[in-house]
C-alpha cells in the first residue's frame, strides 16, 4: 500500500497536488502548518478542503515559533504586502526558513506514518521569487532528510516546471478546475476563491487562469508534454 504526505495550505497549488496524489497513492495524508500567518483563515479552508477531497487524515501543526523569528508581510499585520522587491531582491512576503521547516517536519511525519513520499506545491516558473521554492533547494533538503533519518524518502514537486496556466490545466485534467477556483484560498488578504484581485498571489492566480481559459487546448497539450 502506497502512502504520501501533502504539505497542504488549502491554496490552489497544494490542492492541485492533493487532487493528483489521491489518484496515485492508496493513502494520502495532509499536514498544515499554523505559524500565525497573515491569512490564517487558510487553516480552516485547508481542513474543509482536505475532508471534501477525501484525504485519509489532516494534521494541523503549531509552528508559532516561526512567526517570532521570521519577519515578513505574511507574519506581521502591520507590514503591507508589497508588489515591489526589497533591497535584497526578495518580495517582503518571503518568510525565511518556512519551507526548510515545513519540509523537515513533513519528512519526520512521513517517517512516523511510513510514507514514502512528501508532496509540495512549490515551483520555479511562476514563483514569487522565494529561494526555498527552487528545485535545487528541494533536492538538497531531500538528501539531508534521507541522510539524517537513514530512510528512503522522496520529496516530490509535481508543479515545479509548470506555469500557472498549466497548473490550472492540471486541475481541469482531473475534473476539479471549478472546485479549485471556488474553494481554495491563495489570496494574501484572506479572500477565498478569486481573491482580492490586488495582492501578488492573486495576480499570479488570475493571470494563469485567464491564460488557460483563453487557450485551453494549447495549454493542456503543453501540460501533457510535461507529465
From Swiss-Prot:
Documented EC number(s): 6.3.4.20
Keyword Zinc: yes
Cofactor: record remark: Binds 1 zinc ion per subunit.
Top-level taxon: Bacteria
Protein name in UniProt: 7-cyano-7-deazaguanine synthase
Source organism: Aliivibrio fischeri (strain MJ11) (Vibrio fischeri)
InterPro entries in the record: QueC, Rossmann-like_a/b/a_fold
Pathway involvement of the protein, from the record: Purine metabolism; 7-cyano-7-deazaguanine biosynthesis
